[in-house]
């Protein structure tokens, strides 16, 4: 057991322009090779494109997209008696948001298109409307959890 005491829980900082934690979480997930300024550029360009497309606050579109993609339940592989079962588990809010952001970025990267800002803005707008690859991923996860409800007691 550690003698130092418990570690303080870290909270995500907010970004300089929108002063929002979700935007900062998005920036940190899109980050590659430590190029944070490029990550900020991509996010802010995507936000501008969302503003032009929908003529609404891009922050509200982002919140709506993340709320739509956030899963309530997921499956976790659990080995019981020589066979592996997919056991459904509930997901907390912070873990759910992290998963949603990861799925949105993965879906954006898969999209055909010119640049990442354009692809990300399109995926966020689609997710806010209730369509898109990230929404399909969430629904597939929920279906998988529903199908394996019989194994819920293995938690």
Swiss-Prot record:
Subcellular location(s) of the protein: Plastid, Chloroplast
InterPro entries: Ribosomal_uS7, Ribosomal_uS7_bac/org-type, Ribosomal_uS7_CS, Ribosomal_uS7_dom, Ribosomal_uS7_dom_sf
Any Gene Ontology biological process: translation
Listed GO MF terms: rRNA binding; structural constituent of ribosome
Keyword check for Plastid: yes
The keyword Phosphoprotein appears for this protein: no
Keywords of this entry: Chloroplast, Plastid, Ribonucleoprotein, Ribosomal protein, RNA-binding, rRNA-binding
GO cellular component, one term: small ribosomal subunit
Cysteine disulfide links: none
Quaternary structure annotation from Swiss-Prot or TrEMBL: Part of the 30S ribosomal subunit.
Function: One of the primary rRNA binding proteins, it binds directly to 16S rRNA where it nucleates assembly of the head domain of the 30S subunit.
UniProt record similarity statement: Belongs to the universal ribosomal protein uS7 family.
Protein name: Small ribosomal subunit protein uS7c
Organism of this sequence: Stewartia pseudocamellia (Japanese stewartia)
Gene that encodes the chain: rps7
């Amino acid at each position: 057991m550690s003698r130092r005491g418990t570690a303080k829980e870290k909270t995500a900082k907010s970004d300089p322009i929108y002063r929002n934690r979700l935007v900062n979480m998005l920036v940190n997930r899109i980050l590659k090779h430590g190029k944070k300024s490029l990550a900020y550029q991509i996010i802010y360009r995507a936000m501008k494109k969302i503003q032009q497309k929908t003529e609404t606050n891009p922050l509200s579109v982002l919140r709506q997209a993340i709320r739509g993609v956030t899963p309530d339940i997921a499956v976790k592989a659990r080995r019981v008696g020589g066979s592996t079962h997919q056991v459904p588990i509930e997901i907390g809010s912070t873990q759910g948001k992290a998963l949603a952001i990861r799925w949105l970025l993965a879906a954006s990267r898969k999209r055909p298109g010119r640049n990442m800002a354009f692809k990300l803005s399109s995926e966020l707008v689609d997710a806010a409307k209730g369509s898109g690859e990230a929404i399909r991923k969430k629904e597939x996860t929920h279906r998988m959890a529903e199908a394996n409800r019989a194994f819920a007691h293995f938690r």
